[in-house]
């Protein structure tokens, strides 16, 4: 069946485009007083089966042609959109391809202009160290080992490994002609912006073989002088720096935890710090026939390497958390308190665990319901 066009037929098809109702109506147009339904049935009975089938097929053909034209318009619309997208991608691809081609041609021209120089450069031994220019090191690098450039390595240490440590060289002097230099370097530990501390070293350094010969302490902040006394007595420079950095980290977390507890409890209790901010005291007054005071003390102690009670082989600071509880001046059993403290911190972590400890000790009515 051809749905494309009817213009090629030699015979007259004007009647074939009439609908079924139009064809029936032409036989009895003048009989207006006859019932319509009965008239249609009578007229259909006058048509043979072939004529009825032809009329139905013509109606289906017209509907299909209309649907076909609609689909062709949609196809044309999508083709136009696709052509626009392809044109834009082609332009971008041409630009990228041209850049790659131009770079390749430049490399060919450089290598072909003086091939002997490239071979001689490979044969010549290049000495690369931390003071070598970064671009020169990259040109001569054929392995996957870390870069030696001192500035690049220091930037990674500063930005990623020790982001809260500021290092500044105060002075640099050469001693005689043996390659030894005296550096005065200041280290500032500033994780806790409200209470930072500094330590200044005098170092005798031999750059030729990258050796730290000896070092001295010129100045140290008073807020860590007593705490770091045993650590600095070890005379291990790397151990001292790493331990002080970890001490600053733990101290900053302790300050944040105590401040969070104070903000949560200050409306219903009285909170204050003691023992150089190593202990938080929380007091609540309740009425049980008479006024009774519940006092909770949270101790957050940081022990440095070399202090008493610290494992011998441990070179990093450690923290120990304990609590003490009084009610009406009478102290509770410490063994039971230690078990409660250990269990809640193990279950919830330090921050949430201490919050639950405060609720259990200061607001027991919350758990009695």
Curated annotation (Swiss-Prot):
Gene Ontology biological process: attachment of spindle microtubules to kinetochore; cell division; chromosome segregation; establishment of mitotic sister chromatid cohesion; meiotic cell cycle; mitotic spindle assembly checkpoint signaling; protein localization to chromosome, centromeric region
Domain of life: Eukaryota
Presence of the UniProt keyword Nucleus in the record: yes
Cellular component GO terms held in the UniProt record: COMA complex; kinetochore; nucleus
Subcellular location: Nucleus; Chromosome, Centromere, Kinetochore
Keywords: Cell cycle, Cell division, Centromere, Chromosome, Coiled coil, Kinetochore, Meiosis, Mitosis, Nucleus
Coiled-coil features, chain-numbered ranges: 51-87
Major location (coarse): nucleus
Role played: Component of the kinetochore, a multiprotein complex that assembles on centromeric DNA and attaches chromosomes to spindle microtubules, mediating chromosome segregation and sister chromatid segregation during meiosis and mitosis. Component of the inner kinetochore COMA complex, which connects centromere-associated proteins and the outer kinetochore. COMA interacts with other inner kinetochore proteins to form the inner kinetochore constitutive centromere-associated network (CCAN), which serves as a structural platform for outer kinetochore assembly.
Note: Present with 1254 molecules/cell in log phase SD medium.
Subunit structure: Component of the heterotetrameric kinetochore subcomplex COMA, which consists of AME1, CTF19, MCM21 and OKP1. The COMA subcomplex is part of a larger constitutive centromere-associated network (CCAN) (also known as central kinetochore CTF19 complex in yeast), which is composed of at least AME1, CHL4, CNN1, CTF3, CTF19, IML3, MCM16, MCM21, MCM22, MHF1, MHF2, MIF2, NKP1, NKP2, OKP1 and WIP1. COMA binds the centromeric nucleosome-binding protein MIF2, and to the outer kinetochore MIND subcomplex. CTF19 interacts with the CTF3 complex subunits CTF3, MCM16 and MCM22 as well as CHL4 and IML3.
Family: Belongs to the CENP-P/CTF19 family.
Protein's recorded name: Inner kinetochore subunit CTF19
Taxonomic placement: Eukaryota, Fungi, Dikarya, Ascomycota, Saccharomycotina
